[in-house]
């Protein structure tokens, strides 16, 4: 059995072992991923993947807690990070109340929230109260409506300031999204905590992908940075089509599958 990660072992992976992170929203897939990856992210992307919404903004804290518990049940030895959904960390008081609720009602190891140096004081408050925090800079999905879409972030100086401010505030790692590889590499070198990339090139300390993207289940849209390791949608459609065909023609269930 693989040794369970902690905040300290994640931090110690900086400049040594590439960290592998993947999303999961249920016990079934979490159990499959647990022995392979370093971290599982219960991302607010579930609002799009699981609930079929157009963005992440309407995900609720109740919804996130429900899925976090499913993931923790399926992967009890995994290092699990939970996204704090939009609107749950508007100020320090609300952020702390909601983060404490997450820790009380789930077994997740850490929370993740979006934002740069403007969130540093808030993050510091969480960390001082025993909450492990993963930062998220660059392209911020929770800001997609206000920014007019998903756009690559090019301001290197701002990203460096953001990363350093989050590190000083106490994050144990940072996700950097939608950033040119050379910029992400500079940010990674500038801080002592692991930087996990998504659409940010290969010079970060690790990578994270949405499981349904990398396994080819999400057919509506494929981001440029996603490599599909499986055409899951095609395989599922073929299998269900074969099942439907056998039911229609009366060949299933055969004697082999009957009591």
Curated annotation (Swiss-Prot):
GO terms for biological process: pantothenate biosynthetic process. Binds 1 Mg(2+) ion per subunit. Gene3D superfamilies: Phosphoenolpyruvate-binding domains (3.20.20.60). Its main location: cytoplasm. InterPro entries: Pantoate_hydroxy_MeTrfase (IPR003700), Pyrv/PenolPyrv_kinase-like_dom (IPR015813), Pyrv_kinase-like_dom_sf (IPR040442). Mg(2+) binds at residues 44, 83, 114. GO terms for cellular component: cytoplasm. Homodecamer; pentamer of dimers. Belongs to the PanB family. Catalyzes the reversible reaction in which hydroxymethyl group from 5,10-methylenetetrahydrofolate is transferred onto alpha-ketoisovalerate to form ketopantoate. This is 3-methyl-2-oxobutanoate hydroxymethyltransferase. The gene is panB.
């Amino acid at each position: 059995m693989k040794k369970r990660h902690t905040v300290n072992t994640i931090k110690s992976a900086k400049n040594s072992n590439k960290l592998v992170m993947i999303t999961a929203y249920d016990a079934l897939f979490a159990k499959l991923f647990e022995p392979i990856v370093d971290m599982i992210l219960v991302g607010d992307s579930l609002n799009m993947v699981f609930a079929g919404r157009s963005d992440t903004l309407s995900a609720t804290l109740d919804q996130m807690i429900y899925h976090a518990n499913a993931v923790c049940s399926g992967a009890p030895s995994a290092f699990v990070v939970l996204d704090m959904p939009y609107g749950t960390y508007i100020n320090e008081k609300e952020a702390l109340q909601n983060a404490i609720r997450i820790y009380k009602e789930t077994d997740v190891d850490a929370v993740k929230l979006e934002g740069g140096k403007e969130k540093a004081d808030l993050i510091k408050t969480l960390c001082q109260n025993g909450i492990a925090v993963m930062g998220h800079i660059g392209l911020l999905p929770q800001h997609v409506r206000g920014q007019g879409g998903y756009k690559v972030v090019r301001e290197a100086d701002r990203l460096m300031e953001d990363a350093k401010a989050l590190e000083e505030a106490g994050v144990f790692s940072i996700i950097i999204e939608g950033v040119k590889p050379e910029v992400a590499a500079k940010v990674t070198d500038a801080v002592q905590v692991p930087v996990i990339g998504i659409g940010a090139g290969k010079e970060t300390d690790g990578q994270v992908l949405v499981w349904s993207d990398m396994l080819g289940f999400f057919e509506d849209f494929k981001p440029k940075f996603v490599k599909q390791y499986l055409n899951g949608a095609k395989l599922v459609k073929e299998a269900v089509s074969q099942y439907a065909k056998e039911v229609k023609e009366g060949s299933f269930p055969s004697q082999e599958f009957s009591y």
